[in-house]
Amino acid sequence: MYYIGIDVSKKDLAVFDGKKDLEFINQEGLKSFKKYLKKKYHLQEVAIIFEPTGVYSLYLKEFCAENSIKAYIVNPKKSHNFTRALGKRSKTDKIDARILYQFHKLIDLKDIKVPQIDQEAKTLASYLTSYEFALKQRVSLSHHYRESAR
């Protein structure tokens, strides 16, 4: 089994494969990441370790599900405690990816599975994102209206 630690952010995936630090764009389909994986590994032999970061980690979770890639989604509290136990203080995406990679030493193999995508939860998350955007726009327009009325 080949382990890959990934720190997920809005724009990028910071990846550590045990040897190299890499970076890929976090976008639907993750084409460049898939190309890298196929070139270097058999997808069935890979286990991806990452923390859930809400909407930002959804592309990665879907990618794993669609390509039958095993993943271990780390509870953020466990990851935080593991980082403290290692004595790491500096928080960069590269360091986080390396720490998530090291987390594989604590994982029971039976807990590494291909993620399942709940379509209803995905739809609700999309609605929630749209609603939050509409609220921000309303507040912004309200402030703009008040300023122009003065």
Model-derived regions, located:
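Gly/Thr-rich phosphate-binding beta-strand-loop-beta motif of the actin/hexokinase/Hsp70
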Residues: M1-G18, L100
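Short, glycine/acidic-enriched loop or turn micro-motifs at the edges of active sites
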Residues: K10, G54, K78
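Nucleic-acid-processing active sites and adjacent nucleic-acid-binding tracks
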Residues: G18-A47
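Short, well-ordered alpha-helical microsegments
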Residues: Y56-K61, D111
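Long, charge-rich intrinsically disordered scaffolds of nucleic-acid metabolism proteins
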Residues: K77-R150
